Regions:
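Conserved C-terminal beta-signal and adjacent last beta-strands/turns
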Residues: 494-495, 657, 759-870
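Gram-negative outer-membrane beta-barrel transporters
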Residues: 567, 678, 697-800, 844
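Surface-exposed extracellular loop regions of Gram-negative outer-membrane beta-barrel proteins
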Residues: 236, 377-389, 503-508, 619-663, ...
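Acidic, small-polar-rich N-terminal luminal/periplasmic segments of exported/outer-membrane proteins
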Residues: 90, 105, 146-297, 302, ...
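Acidic/polar loop-and-plug regions of large Gram-negative outer-membrane beta-barrel proteins
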Residues: 337-341, 353-360, 364-428, 432, ...
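Outer-membrane beta-barrel translocator/receptor signature
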Residues: 263-265, 276-355, 361-365, 419, ...
């Protein structure tokens, strides 16, 4: 969709899809009157500048100043934006003037006058200087624009904003600099705001379903080969076979509610190691999220939603200026949601608010303050899962229904709350150096009272273990960096030098109640009410549990240089991290058959770890849009486990080789990418087979594969995303052996032990494919109506470390529609209806299994909303 510039009844639009994200300034009604243009000339593009024209130069110095430019032949509007970026020149022209026109190529060192004359050669257009603006007109028209008053600064697409349609061309993910994706030598994928609007994901996992290299439905899995065995923010997604970490505005988050989609402008996926810029990260990559912040143009939107399972939702998102000049702006996003789920007695309830304010202190200094609060008394997840006999394998009475709840309605509490404060500060000292800083404080708490599944007694009955958990955490993080540019002859440098720290404190308590026979339930005909919780560590209660208190401080220093010589871009970076686990106290309370209770308290020694990570890559941009690249990068994750002798483990260390292609198809807004990679990770941990209370270093995991993707605004009313991923993740070096699991034997898991070496990592699909399209037909009879749909395929996954059984593959279909009321009735401008249906056929499928349970995928979900923008 085109962003809009407010005028007297006419939209100011950019023609090229690359420019649709240009933030349009407000043009007052007096401007339109002063221009005296017809309605056909009311659409204006203004590109910032400082230069002169052929007719009335501002100054001799400005006219004669020379610039080195290299702009290939392309759409005229794109060439003008490139010239503006290269020279700092401000251009004003009506979009009708550039429609269908192509520019001539320019290359060399020349003045703005010479560059404009060459670009416009053969287009039938000329230019003249009007005040401080270069105005384009038809050579024969002699149309003269009056003074242009612009309320705001027009710039190209924001590197942290919502993107344009399904495509984003610029990003800060992976480099912390505003860089075109086609100049970064590694895999980065952007989920734009429009894609989220069309697909209606309720959380980040659902938003990631169409992203290459990401398995977003691995709920409830525990990956032995995954790099991150810490809190993964309630998510079950994997990147290139490794569990992932989430970052908000560049800082790692441990929030249990991270990534409320109603609060996000975009989601950025960096596949591959990213430790150089972000510290502790898995070799699979990171998930970056950008919170909504005040916009330069007013924004007002509200919506009400509905859906199956009793869903009702309301959201609001408003942004406007506070001061008359607009140097102080605010934004407020809020959500209220209540609904059931496909499983009885499992509900989702949430209220949240995200206020923010931006103060442009002066032309060089800006400060943004954000705060958020999310209260989720029911998080809608059913982590208990179901037995494999009755889901993965045919049961005596068929499959267990998705609606089946195997817990107790009176012992069923899953919820969390999170509070956060953040500020982002920037100051530009001069054209060479600027300073950027991000700070966040967040506090999160999660509670869980459920019954987890234990042994399956027979074909119909299974034993449950009552469980209660309480996790609270507090995180303080800051990232401060100097960013700058300089040239060494024909070579340009875009450098970053920075430091960040993160202080994380967590307290985790848990208790199991081994009640016995009263906790057994029939999986096909559950009867509730037979269980009464008994917790207290007394001889009357058969409970076992403990508490852990953990504190970590991490600090890192990093540097990066993006070197560019003509069409060649080279990326070099390095980082050193120091990690201190300053406090690790564990208290274990357990059963004793003699006196009924025993208590064990232990205080673990603190540990210090450090690691150096680095990366290097290069990418070459051919003039016809192709950009091949190669990169090498490393990662690390500090580990908190201890072996049976009380010794700490080495950090998880990973490295990746990646080779790929990026192709921006000329004359289109279509970005195609392909990447092949090889990742290895050392020192992953498993439970010590000789002492199950401790961990053991299992060895090395290798993941290799390739990804292809497309993000495309094919034409004005047709957008698409598509991807294919192949992942081969294996245990390549290990001394660990595991039993062959026999899911038919109910309690029998005593098969012969075999080595895990060479086996596939469990719950990692080798093949994934997806495609999603949205189309609004231009026909008058269907004016305002749009349709969309998608296909998702996930290959089979092995369910244990020795690959003795597997969960089958599945194919899902999603469809949707939307209607713009204003397209047919002008009085209803801004009113829009939306419908999104996932898993259209209501397919029964399994996302993953382990040796104790399987997890069912979501059935048919129907979401709709009505939104109004004003």
């Amino acid at each position: 969709m085109h962003p809009k510039i407010a005028t007297a009844g006419a939209d100011l639009l950019s023609v090229n899809p690359r420019e649709r994200a240009i933030k349009a300034p407000l043009v007052t009604l007096s401007l339109v009157r002063m221009l005296g243009l017809t309605t056909a000339l009311a659409s204006v593009v203004i590109v910032p500048v400082k230069a002169a024209s052929a007719d009335t130069p501002a100054s001799t110095t400005a006219v004669e100043r020379k610039f080195t430019v290299n702009i290939p032949a392309q759409k005229l509007s794109s060439a003008l934006v490139a010239l503006s970026n290269a020279t700092g020149t401000q251009l004003a022209y009506t979009t009708q003037l550039s429609d269908g026109l192509r520019s001539s190529a320019i290359s060399g060192t020349m003045s703005v006058n010479a560059a404009l004359a060459q670009i416009l050669s053969g287009t039938g257009l000329t230019y003249q200087f009007n005040g401080n603006t270069v105005v384009l007109t038809k050579a024969s028209a002699n149309i003269k624009l009056g003074p242009v008053r612009v309320g705001g600064t027009l710039s190209r697409e924001s590197a942290t904003g919502p993107g344009v349609g399904y495509v984003a061309h610029y990003t800060t993910a992976g480099t912390k600099t505003d860089t075109p994706i086609t100049e970064i030598p590694n895999s980065i994928y952007i989920i734009t705001k429009q894609q989220m609007v069309d697909q209606q994901p309720q959380n980040v996992m659902q938003a990631l379903r169409y992203t290459p290299g990401v398995y977003a439905d691995a709920l409830g899995t525990a990956q032995n080969g995954a790099a991150d065995n810490q809190n993964n923010n309630g998510g079950g997604f994997l990147q290139r076979g490794f569990s992932s970490m989430q970052f908000i505005d560049g800082l790692q988050t441990n929030s249990q509610s991270a990534g409320e989609t109603a609060f996000l402008d975009r989601i950025e996926v960096v596949n591959g190691p990213a430790s150089v810029m972000y510290g502790q990260t898995s070799p699979g990559g990171i998930i970056g999220m950008s919170l909504k912040k005040p916009t330069e143009t007013p924004l007002h939107e509200a919506s009400v939603g509905f859906g199956n399972w009793g869903r009702y939702e309301a959201t609001i998102d408003v942004s406007d200026k506070i001061t008359k000049s607009g140097n102080v702006r605010y934004r407020l996003a809020a959500i209220g949601d209540t609904q059931g789920t496909q499983t009885k007695y499992v509900d989702y309830h949430r209220v949240g608010v995200l206020p923010s304010i931006t103060w442009d202190i002066d032309k060089k200094t800006s400060l943004t303050l954000l705060g958020s609060y999310l209260y989720t008394p029911g998080n809608g997840t059913y982590r208990t899962g179901y037995p494999s006999h009755g889901t993965l394998l045919p049961g005596e009475y068929g499959r267990i229904a998705r609606s089946t709840f195997l817990g107790e309605p009176d012992w069923n509490k899953t919820g969390d709350r999170t509070a956060m404060f953040e500020y982002l500060f920037t100051h530009k000292f001069n054209k060479y150096v600027s300073f950027e800083q991000t700070f966040r404080w967040e506090k999160s708490r999660k509670i869980n009272e459920t019954l987890s599944l234990d042994d399956q007694i027979d074909a119909s009955n299974i034993e449950r273990i009552p469980l209660q958990q309480n996790l609270s955490s507090k995180t303080i993080g800051m990232d401060a960096r100097f960013v700058g540019k300089f040239n060494t002859g024909p070579v340009s440098h875009h450098w970053v030098v920075g430091s960040d720290f993160r202080k994380y404190d967590a307290s985790f308590g848990y208790q199991f109640d081994y009640t016995g026979d009263e906790s057994i339930i029939n999986i096909y005909n559950p009867v509730y009410g037979g269980y009464t919780p008994c917790f207290g560590y007394t001889s009357n209660c058969k409970d076992f549990g403990g508490t852990s208190t953990f504190s970590r401080f991490q600090e890192g220093v990093y540097f990066q240089d993006q070197i560019k010589y003509k069409n060649l871009s080279i990326l070099l970076g390095g980082r050193n991290d120091w990690v201190s686990n300053t406090n690790y106290i564990q208290s274990i309370n357990g059963l004793n058959p003699t006196n009924g209770i025993t208590v064990k308290n232990s205080q673990r020694p603190y540990s210090n770890q450090s690691a150096f990570t680095w990366r290097a890559g290069l990418i070459y941009n051919f003039k016809f849009g192709l950009a091949p690249y190669f990169s090498y990068s490393t990662s690390f994750v500090p580990q908190t486990g201890f072996d049976s002798h009380g010794n700490t483990f080495s950090p998880l260390t990973g490295k990746q080789y990646e080779i790929g292609l990026k192709y921006q198809i000329p004359k289109t807004d279509v970005l195609l990418t392909a990447a092949a990679y090889h990742i290895s990770e050392n020192h992953y941990l498993v439970t010590d087979p000789n002492n199950t209370n401790y961990s053991a270093d299992a060895g090395k995991v290798t993941s290799e594969g390739f990804e292809v993707s497309a993000h495309a605004n094919i034409i004005k009313n047709l957008q698409a995303v598509a991807s294919y991923s192949y992942i081969d993740a294996r245990y390549t070096r290990t001394n660990v052996t595991s039993s062959v699991y026999n899911p038919n034997g109910f309690l029998d898991q005593s098969g012969a032990d075999i080595s895990e070496k060479g086996k596939y990592v469990q719950n990692v699909p080798r093949n994934m494919f997806s495609i999603f399209l949205d189309y609004t037909p231009p026909l008058n009879i269907l004016k305002g109506i749009g349709i969309n749909g998608g296909i998702r395929y996930v290959g089979f996954t092995y369910s244990d470390a020795v690959n003795s059984y597997k969960a089958p593959d599945y194919l899902l279909f999603d469809i949707g529609a939307h209607y713009d009321f204003g397209a047919t009735v002008s009085a209803l401008k801004g009113l829009r209806a939306q419908l999104a249906i996932s898993n259209l056929t209501n397919k029964y499928y399994i996302t993953s299994c382990n040796t104790s349970s399987c997890y069912l995928g979501e059935g048919r979900r129907v979401y709709g909303n009505i939104s109004y923008s004003w």
